[in-house]
Amino acid sequence: MKNRIKELRARLNLTQDELARKVGVRRETIVFLEKGKYNPSLQLAHDVAKALGAKRIEDVFVFG
């Protein structure tokens, strides 16, 4: 699954560790998400989008 996590995280000057803490997951989870090696649950996608200041999950994740 493609996503804009790295791009949006960089705009906010957040490290992977800082984003992970905001979301409540391990840094490795953020790494896997950014690389597209892990498909998040709906809840995790929502939490990541919220932590990145996105209005919609679709602003961060590309489904399909």
Predicted regions and their residues:
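DNA major-groove recognition helix of helix-turn-helix/homeodomain DNA-binding modules
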Residues: 43-59
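A short, Lys/Arg-rich alpha-helix, primarily the initiator
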Residues: 1-11
